[in-house]
UniProtKB/Swiss-Prot annotation:
Its cofactor is Fe(2+). Keywords: Aromatic hydrocarbons catabolism, Dioxygenase, Iron, Oxidoreductase. GO terms for molecular function: 3-carboxyethylcatechol 2,3-dioxygenase activity; ferrous iron binding. Pfam families: LigB. SUPFAM superfamilies: LigB-like (SSF53213). Pathway: Aromatic compound metabolism; 3-phenylpropanoate degradation. It catalyses: 3-(2,3-dihydroxyphenyl)propanoate + O2 = (2Z,4E)-2-hydroxy-6-oxonona-2,4-dienedioate + H(+); (2E)-3-(2,3-dihydroxyphenyl)prop-2-enoate + O2 = (2Z,4E,7E)-2-hydroxy-6-oxonona-2,4,7-trienedioate + H(+). This is 2,3-dihydroxyphenylpropionate/2,3-dihydroxicinnamic acid 1,2-dioxygenase. Coiled coil: none annotated. Homotetramer.
Length: 316
């Protein structure tokens, strides 16, 4: 059955630390075109692969992958808040299909997602609940993480099940490429920070505002060239995007955590969401992909990209 893939970078900094107006407008046009494709496709189901930034998943139990059978968005950085329209029975069926394919995945009936998921849904569909949606969390910031190969196999297992569903499916991959915003790490953390990373759910409004202010300040310093954060790496980004565009997904299996961190920054591990999304698409057969946009945007601390793809059989 028909499938459409949309992969895009997200940023919590939009509206807080923006690049030049012409760049904001440029990104807006790319998003509008993607939104029009989705509206024309009119999906019956959305599956969104997304990371989390210590807003919904913590070290008390940190799964490598988790499928949401019920989910709500926390509304960080002004992103949409509220309940996602998750078909619980279908989410459970998908989890069972993934496990049957020998890929270990957790299941949550109380998943919380942040801007990493909600922003993509807002950009592409206009809301959290316009279409039935199954969120799939991929741990991308909290070591240890599943390998890129396992992310691909997760996507493949989901894609094979979705291809048998008889539905028009929109597959979304939401994540940054090269980037390293100021995300805290458990290793070497103070007791206070460690506790927040282990069990920091539902912070106070003041705590969330303070975290937001730190991130915005870091972005302004980064854009001004006064930062120790890892620089953006357009060369690495373009090489990664080219592998996706050419359908060379197995080549991504060899991407190691240490190499990703060294070349593209500690949050570039979010490329696992793109890998999983393309893995799901490739389960439908060979595909044709288009790189719609790429630009390094220091103000958003992001190598910012967007791609869409369809199976070749559906584009002939």
């Amino acid at each position: 059955m028909p499938v459409l893939l949309e992969c895009l970078s997200h940023t919590p900094l939009s509206g807080y630390c923006d690049p030049a107006p012409e760049v904001v407008a440029e990104v807006g046009r790319i998003h509008a075109a993607a939104r029009a494709r989705v509206a024309d496709f009119d999906p019956q189901l959305v599956v969104v692969f997304a990371p989390d930034h210590y807003n919904g998943f913590f070290y008390d139990v940190m799964p490598p992958f988790c499928i949401g059978a019920s989910a709500s968005a926390v509304g960080d950085f002004g992103s949409l808040a509220g309940q996602l329209a998750v078909p619980a029975d279908l989410a459970l069926d998908l989890a069972q299909a993934v496990l049957a394919a020998d890929v270990d995945v957790a299941l949550s009936y109380r998943m919380q997602v942040d801007h990493g998921c909600a922003q993509a849904l807002e950009i592409l569909t206009g809301s959290l609940d316009r279409y039935p949606v199954v969120p799939v969390f991929i741990n991308s910031v909290a070591p240890p993480m599943a390998s890129c190969r396992r992310a691909r196999l997760l996507g493949d297992a989901l894609g094979r099940s979705l291809a048998r569903s008889g539905q028009r499916v929109l597959v979304i991959g939401s994540g940054g490429i090269s980037h390293e915003p100021p995300v805290p790490e458990l290793a070497g953390a103070t007791d206070e920070v460690a506790e927040r990373l282990i069990a920091g759910r539902n912070p106070s409004r003041e705590a969330r505002a303070a975290r937001q202010a730190r991130t915005v300040a870091a972005a302004r310093a980064f854009a001004a060239g006064d930062s120790r954060l890892h620089p953006l790496n357009p060369e690495w980004d373009r090489a990664f995007l080219k592998l996706l565009e050419e359908g060379q997904l197995p080549a991504l299996d060899g991407f190691t955590d240490s190499a990703i961190t060294r070349e593209a920054g500690k949050s570039a591990h979010e490329v696992r969401t793109w890998i999983a999304a393309f893995g799901a698409l490739q389960a439908y057969g060979p595909y044709r992909a288009t790189l719609d946009y790429y630009r390094p945007i220091p103000e958003w601390i992001a190598g910012f990209g967007a791609m869409h793809a369809r199976p070749i059989a559906e584009t002939a």
